[in-house]
């Protein structure tokens, strides 16, 4: 594929931006077209609620959207989409298919990898997960002293942690009758020490989530959990009732002391950051029940079908991706804010921080050459309204343009005080995108200050500070209610957005070589931290840091 910057469709888009980009003004665009909302929004109608994607508050015209869709076609998005769904090895650096869509393929139509249908294996693992969940949640699965299981400790990192953690937090209202779930990821001993201090080994089950069963952070934490358990249990054979593995390495799982019957398999075509739909989601299923886990899969499958079959110009993941391309590659935006107005989604931005930045944080193309344009953005965000009192100042009046996605459910899980809290939340959600779009003109600010009775001197002094330029782009994503089905659909929508952008940039969204170098160097440094001898084998900075740490390890603190 030709470089993006040499693609005629991209050049056409850039030329339009150079000639007209500075003239784009959202107030004027809305004034000129009273039907703008209808022209630049989509409603996705499912049998489990509706999703409105309003992208009318973006710096686009119908001509721009046509050019963006033409760019997607020129970059081969449709063909690449089919290659993914057909099980081709689109993760070309690792020689792997990319089939998280198979994990939630509720239609059960065959999906082939190397000529073999993967669906029987997918369904076999789902059945095993269902059986295990039912046994634990019903109290049939007992600990070594006969106690029912009240707590699940999920030990993993990256995709084995962020996805399940985000989903169990998001679906807390659906957890009735399930065990509590705790997540341990950080190698920092504080994380596991604080967690285990609250738990009883007799009624806890640890899930060790590691594809290879060699991930240093996960296995170190798992061994610590086993030590903690055996301090009480004394008998290594009791491990079988309290530890399960999510892995592909049967040998290592057995060596750890886990019965292979308690090992839940997944496959090399499941990427870590796309794995919550697999056995990695066992903690989700235990917490909210397997029926709700299946609803999560069904919502994602619904979005998969929308993504695969809907024309590009009406395709939610594609449109979100193209708007991102517009801002990153024409306007030069470097960050993207995800702002869910739902406290249950408080880990949503963190989840897609990995999903997006580990996928598209690349500068080498499929042909092995360095890109000559920007790729993945910095993704960040916090739930509303907390963010309004933290960083929205910069979004409104800072010097950087930050495209934002605002998300909110129409119906709350907690309609307390006759829905007052949610009404205030909705009002703030709506006000923010309007404020970012409209801003406040000098004349409007002047009238406001005059009405407040300011003296002419104070008015002139305050006036420039009270002006909002506006013209800040946002997407509003409004959905009926945060249910398992709806969450699955939203997560899949963003997954496919990331995929589309990777295709347009001609990078591999499904490897993560950038994670490896630091891990390699850490293995070399770890033994150098032993003893008190000065270290001189690195650059001056790293040597200085190591030697300071050695010196301060034994320091007495007053």
Curated annotation (Swiss-Prot):
The modification N6-(2-hydroxyisobutyryl)lysine is found at residue 34. InterPro entries: G6P_Isomerase, G6P_Isomerase_C, Phosphoglucose_isomerase_CS, SIS_dom_sf, SIS_PGI_1, SIS_PGI_2. Keywords: Acetylation, Cytokine, Cytoplasm, Gluconeogenesis, Glycolysis, Hydroxylation, Isomerase, Phosphoprotein, Secreted, Ubl conjugation. It is found in: Cytoplasm; Secreted. Pfam families: PGI. It catalyses: alpha-D-glucose 6-phosphate = beta-D-fructose 6-phosphate. The modification N6-succinyllysine is found at residue 454. The modification Phosphothreonine is found at residues 109, 250. The active site is at 358 (proton donor), 389, 519. The modification N6-acetyllysine is found at residues 12, 142, 454. D-glucose 6-phosphate binds at residues 159-160, 210-215, 354, 358, 389, 519. GO terms for molecular function: carbohydrate derivative binding; cytokine activity; glucose-6-phosphate isomerase activity; monosaccharide binding. The modification Phosphoserine is found at residues 107, 185, 455. Phosphorylation at Ser-185 by CK2 has been shown to decrease enzymatic activity and may contribute to secretion by a non-classical secretory pathway. ISGylated. Its EC number is 5.3.1.9. It comes from the Eukaryota. GO terms for biological process: gluconeogenesis; glucose 6-phosphate metabolic process; glycolytic process. PROSITE patterns: P_GLUCOSE_ISOMERASE_1, P_GLUCOSE_ISOMERASE_2, P_GLUCOSE_ISOMERASE_3. Homodimer; in the catalytically active form. Monomer in the secreted form. Belongs to the GPI family. This is Glucose-6-phosphate isomerase. It comes from Pongo abelii.
């Amino acid at each position: 594929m030709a470089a993006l910057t040499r693609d005629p469709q991209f050049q056409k888009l850039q030329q339009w931006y150079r000639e007209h980009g500075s003239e784009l003004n959202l107030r004027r665009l809305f004034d000129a077209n009273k039907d703008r909302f209808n022209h630049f929004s989509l409603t996705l109608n499912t049998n489990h609620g509706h999703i409105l994607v309003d992208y009318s508050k973006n710096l686009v015209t119908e001509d721009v959207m046509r050019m963006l869709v033409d760019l997607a076609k020129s970059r081969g998005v449709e063909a690449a989409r089919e290659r993914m769904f057909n099980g081709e090895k689109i993760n070309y650096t690792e020689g792997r298919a990319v089939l998280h869509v198979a994990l939630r393929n509720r239609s059960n139509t065959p999906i082939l990898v190397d000529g073999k249908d993967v669906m029987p294996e997918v369904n076999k693992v789902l059945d095993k997960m269902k059986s295990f969940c039912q046994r634990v949640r019903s109290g049939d699965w007992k600990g070594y002293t006969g106690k029912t299981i009240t707590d699940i400790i999920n030990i993993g990192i990256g995709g084995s942690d962020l996805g399940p953690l985000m989903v169990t937090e998001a679906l807390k209202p659906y957890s009735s009758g399930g065990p509590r779930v705790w997540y341990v990821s950080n190698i920092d001993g504080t994380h596991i020490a604080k967690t285990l201090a609250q738990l009883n080994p007799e009624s806890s089950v640890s899930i060790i989530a590691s594809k290879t069963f060699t991930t240093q952070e996960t296995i170190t934490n798992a061994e610590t959990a086993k030590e903690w358990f055996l301090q009480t249990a004394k008998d290594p054979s009791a491990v079988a009732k309290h530890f399960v593995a999510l892995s592909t390495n049967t040998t290592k799982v057995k060596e750890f002391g886990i019965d292979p019957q308690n090992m839940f398999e997944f496959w090399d075509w499941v990427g870590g950051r796309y794995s919550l739909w697999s056995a990695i989601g066992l903690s989700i299923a235990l917490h909210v029940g397997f029926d709700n886990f299946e609803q999560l899969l069904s919502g994602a499958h619904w979005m998969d079908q929308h993504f695969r079959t809907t024309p590009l110009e009406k395709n939610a993941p594609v449109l979100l991706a193209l708007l991102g391309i517009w801002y990153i590659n024409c306007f030069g935006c470097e960050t993207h804010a995800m702002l869910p107005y739902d406290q249950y989604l408080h880990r949503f931005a963190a989840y897609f921080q990995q999903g997006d930045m580990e996928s598209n944080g690349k500068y080498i193309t499929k042909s092995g050459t360095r890109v000559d344009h920007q790729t993945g953005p910095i993704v960040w965000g916090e739930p509303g309204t907390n963010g309004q009192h933290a960083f929205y100042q910069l979004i409104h009046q800072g010097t950087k343009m930050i495209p934002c996605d605002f998300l909110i459910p129409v119906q709350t899980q907690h309609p307390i005080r006759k829905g007052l809290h949610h009404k205030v939340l909705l009002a703030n959600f709506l006000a923010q995108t309007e404020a970012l779009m409209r801003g406040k003109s000098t004349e409007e600010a002047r009238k406001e200050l005059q009405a407040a009775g300011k003296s002419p001197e104070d008015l002139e002094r305050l006036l420039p500070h009270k002006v909002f330029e506006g013209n800040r782009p946002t997407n509003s994503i409004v959905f009926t209610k945060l249910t398992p089905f709806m969450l699955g659909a939203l997560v899949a929508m963003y997954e496919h957005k990331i995929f589309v952008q990777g295709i347009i940039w001609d990078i591999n969204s499904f490897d993560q070589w950038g994670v490896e170098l630091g891990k390699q160097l850490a293995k070399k440094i770890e033994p150098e931290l032993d003893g008190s001898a000065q270290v001189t084998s690195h650059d001056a900075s790293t040597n200085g840091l190591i030697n300071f740490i050695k010196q301060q390890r034994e320091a007495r603190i007053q």
